[in-house]
Regions:
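Solvent-exposed loop/turn segments at secondary-structure junctions
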Residues: 109-111, 150-154, 176-181, 196-198, ...
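N-terminal Lys/Arg-rich, disordered targeting/topogenic segments
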Residues: 1-20, 27
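Structural recognition of the beta-strand scaffold that forms the well-ordered cores
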Residues: 101-105, 143-147, 170-174, 189-191, ...
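Hydrophobic membrane-insertion alpha-helices, especially the h-region
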Residues: 22-38
Length: 274
C-alpha cells in the first residue's frame, strides 16, 4: 500500500509540475501579448503626434498633397478677360447701356449662306458673334431685338420691318466681308447709307473709336446702298467684321477667343457713341 501511495504521490507531483509549467508558459504568452499591444499603442500615438506637426501642404503616403484650408487655391486657368488682354492687348470696360434699345441683325441665314471660305459659311460666323454681342449688351442693361436667333432665312424686307417696329436707337447689322480677287485685303469696315446723316455720324464715330483701340486694322467708314440700311427708319450701320477671303482673318473670325474679343470691342465702342 505504501508503495502504491508513493507512486500515486509521484504521479500527482509530476502532473502538478506540468500544470505549473503550462501556467507559467500561458502567463508568459499573455504578458508578451500585453507588452506588444502597449508598445504598438505607444508608437501609434507618437506617429499621430508627429503627423500633426507636419506642414499641412506636405505630401501624404499616397502622393496626394494635403491642402491648407487657410490658403486660397488659385485656378491656373486664366479668366476670359485676362486671356483677351494678354492676347489682343484689349481691356474691356463694361459700358452702361441702360435705356438703350438696339436691333441686332445677323447677316444671311438659312438657305442664304453669305460668303464662304472652304467649309466656313458667313451666316454661321455672323450668328455666333451677334449672339455674343446680344449677351454683352443685355448684361450692360440694353434692350435688344434680334432679326434672327437661329439658322433661319429672314428676307431683307422682314429684317427692315422688325427693325422699324422696334423704334430703336440703332439698327446694327453684322457681316463678314470677302474679296476673292485679292486675299491679302484685310480689316474691319463700317457701312452707312448716304441719305442718313445720323447713320453717317454713327458709322464714322464707331470707326474712330475702334481705331483708337489700336488692336486690329480698321478701314474707313463708307457709304453703301444696302437695303437694310436704305429702308431703316432708325439710325443704321453695318459692320463688316473682317475678310473671310483672307486666311488670317478667317482663322480669327472662327476662333472662339477672337469672337469674344471682337464682340466686346463692338459693344463698348457702339455704346460709347450713342
Amino acid at each position: 500500500m505504501n508503495r502504491r501511495r508513493q507512486r500515486s504521490l509521484r504521479r500527482l507531483k509530476n502532473q502538478l509540475k506540468r500544470i505549473g509549467i503550462l501556467l507559467a508558459l500561458l502567463i508568459a504568452v499573455i504578458l508578451m501579448i500585453c507588452g506588444c499591444l502597449y508598445i504598438g499603442e505607444h508608437l501609434f500615438k507618437k506617429d499621430k503626434q508627429s503627423d500633426s506637426k507636419k506642414d499641412p501642404d506636405e505630401t501624404n503616403i499616397s502622393g496626394d498633397v494635403q491642402p491648407n484650408p487657410d490658403q486660397t487655391v488659385t485656378d491656373p486657368v486664366l479668366d476670359l478677360e485676362t486671356q483677351i488682354l494678354n492676347t489682343y492687348n484689349y481691356q474691356y470696360a463694361k459700358p452702361n447701356a441702360s435705356g438703350i434699345h438696339i436691333v441686332l441683325d445677323a447677316g444671311h441665314g438659312g438657305v442664304d449662306g453669305g460668303t464662304q471660305a472652304g467649309e466656313i459659311l458667313e451666316k454661321d460666323v455672323n450668328l455666333t458673334i451677334t449672339k455674343k454681342v446680344q449677351t454683352l449688351l443685355e448684361e450692360a442693361g440694353a434692350t435688344v431685338t434680334m432679326t434672327r436667333e437661329t439658322d433661319d432665312y429672314v428676307d431683307l424686307a422682314d429684317r427692315t420691318r422688325i427693325g422699324n417696329q422696334a423704334s430703336a436707337n440703332l439698327f446694327l447689322s453684322l457681316h463678314c466681308n470677302s474679296y476673292e480677287d485679292d486675299s491679302s485685303i484685310t480689316g474691319l469696315e463700317v457701312y452707312y447709307h448716304k441719305n442718313s446723316d445720323i447713320s453717317k455720324q454713327y458709322a464714322e464715330a464707331v470707326t474712330q473709336a475702334l481705331k483708337d483701340t489700336q488692336t486690329i486694322r480698321i478701314r474707313e467708314a463708307s457709304k453703301q446702298n444696302m437695303q437694310v440700311l436704305r429702308n431703316s427708319s432708325n439710325p443704321a450701320i453695318m459692320i463688316e467684321m473682317g475678310f473671310l477671303s483672307n486666311p488670317e482673318e478667317c482663322a480669327n473670325l472662327t476662333d472662339p477667343l477672337y469672337q469674344e474679343f471682337i464682340s466686346r470691342m463692338i459693344v463698348e465702342k457702339v455704346i460709347s457713341i450713342l
